[in-house]
């Protein structure tokens, strides 16, 4: 099974578990760091994410993973909040944070810049529009390597 198929399969099975515990499944990733593999599950809710919430989701997901055993190699399971400087992966995430400040990291420079920061004004399937100072800047989505919420306390 490909990594993408694994993640999609896990999303379908973990999403109802998270929702049953009053959390939204924000993102899943399976990564190798050094010699270790990590299955990272990010959860969110309107009221924030507590350590106890992460523990509950972790226990429930761990039971599921023990039952279905989808990953042949050894790995560590991590459940956490996406954090204040969260990556915005989907259109749903972008929609939620319209009006907030974001950071766009680019694969290659546009106007000699590889990083743009500004208020998320709008987006569509092809581009993201941000307000930088008083100007609207349009960045093609295929040029964007990473979109991050600019965490502000």
From Swiss-Prot:
Keyword DNA damage on entry: no
Family assignment from sequence similarity: Belongs to the RimP family.
Assigned keywords, A-Z: Cytoplasm, Ribosome biogenesis
Entries under InterPro entries matching the protein: Ribosome_maturation_RimP, RimP_C, RimP_C_sf, RimP_N, RimP_N_sf
Entry function: Required for maturation of 30S ribosomal subunits.
Leader sequence residues: none
A cellular-component GO term for this protein: cytosol
Organism annotation: Clostridium botulinum (strain Okra / Type B1)
Protein name: Ribosome maturation factor RimP
A UniProt-annotated Pfam family: RimP_N
Cytoplasm as UniProt keyword: yes
Subcellular location: Cytoplasm
């Amino acid at each position: 099974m490909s990594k993408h198929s694994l993640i999609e399969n896990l999303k379908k099975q973990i999403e109802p578990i998270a929702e049953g515990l009053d959390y939204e499944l924000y993102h899943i990733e399976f990564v190798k760091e050094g010699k270790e593999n990590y299955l990272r599950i990010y959860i969110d809710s309107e009221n924030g994410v507590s350590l106890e919430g992460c523990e509950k989701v972790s226990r429930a997901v761990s039971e599921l993973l023990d039952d279905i055993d989808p990953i042949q190699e050894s790995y560590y399971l991590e459940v956490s909040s996406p954090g204040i400087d969260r990556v915005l992966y989907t259109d749903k995430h972008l929609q939620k944070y319209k009006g907030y400040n974001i950071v766009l990291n680019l694969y290659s420079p546009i106007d000699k810049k590889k990083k743009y920061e500004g208020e998320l004004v709008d987006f569509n399937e092809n581009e993201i529009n941000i307000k930088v100072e008083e100007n609207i800047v349009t960045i093609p989505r295929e040029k964007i390597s990473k979109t991050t919420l600019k965490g502000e306390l």
